[in-house]
Design a protein with these regions (language model features):
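N-terminal leader/targeting segments and the immediate start of mature chains
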Residues: 1-39, 46-51, 176-187
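Short beta-strand micro-motifs enriched in acidic
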Residues: 46-48, 109-111, 136-140
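An acidic-aromatic
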Residues: 44-91, 151-156
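Non-transmembrane domains of secretory- and envelope-associated proteins
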Residues: 113, 124-131, 139-187
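Flexible, processing/modification-adjacent segments and terminal tails
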Residues: 7-26, 38, 67, 71-131, ...
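Short, surface-exposed coil-to-beta transition loops
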Residues: 38-41, 55-57, 64-65, 128-133, ...
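Residue-level detector of beta-strand structural context in well-folded domains
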Residues: 43, 52, 59, 104-108, ...
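Short beta-strand segments that buttress and anchor functional surface loops
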Residues: 27-29, 53-57, 118-125, 145-150
């Protein structure tokens, strides 16, 4: 059609990539309250769409689209739950962008060096306690580099290292060892 201009936002393209491709990255999660020193937690994440698998120290979590698996190596315990939206977003902040983008005011701007796009989502209404969500995406590849989530006085930042889209499809569930205590709370 002549004269038709279609503008595709970076956020829309990024969300499509998350739905269609498998993202894998190491990260450092930093959590800070206004008066406290920040705490850092290293980990790794693999995700596609709503499904994800992440590891942080002695904790592993996975979501297969229905069941949340939370494993603690310290207690050798695996909890199975049907998570709420809030529990999913607390486990994987990318899900906020996937689930809530339509309910937010969205702005996009180039970083000072022009190599990234900074996407800010501000909920129009109180949404799961989140006041602001900022995502930094590498231009061209649409790989996420950083996510910042503000909830009241708490700021959580997820800085990704070596993000890539992979072709190997991982299992988005955790299988217990024979000695693992399984606590099935899916009722």
């Amino acid at each position: 059609m002549k004269g038709l201009l279609v503008i595709v936002s970076v956020l829309s393209s990024f969300l499509t990539s998350l739905e269609q491709k498998t993202l894998k990255a190491d990260f450092v999660a930093t959590v800070a309250e206004t008066a406290d020193a920040p705490m850092n937690y290293p980990g790794s994440i693999t995700m596609k769409g709503k499904q994800f698998r992440l590891s942080m120290g002695s904790i592993e979590a996975a979501f297969d689209g229905q069941t949340m698996y939370m494993y603690s190596a310290e207690t050798d315990e695996l909890n199975l739950t049907l998570p709420t939206d809030r529990e999913l977003i607390e486990s994987n902040p990318f899900l906020f962008a996937l689930e809530m983008a339509q309910q937010c005011e969205v702005t996009e701007r180039a970083s000072s060096d022009g190599k990234q796009t900074i996407i800010t989502l501000v909920p129009r209404e109180e949404t799961l306690g989140i006041n602001r969500f900022v995502l930094k995406v590498q231009n061209g590849t649409l790989l996420p580099l950083q996510v910042e989530v503000r909830e009241g006085t708490k700021t959580s930042t997820l800085t990704l290292m070596g993000p890539s889209f992979i072709t190997t499809e991982p299992k988005y569930m955790l299988e217990p060892e024979e000695t693992t205590f399984v606590n099935d709370l899916r009722f």
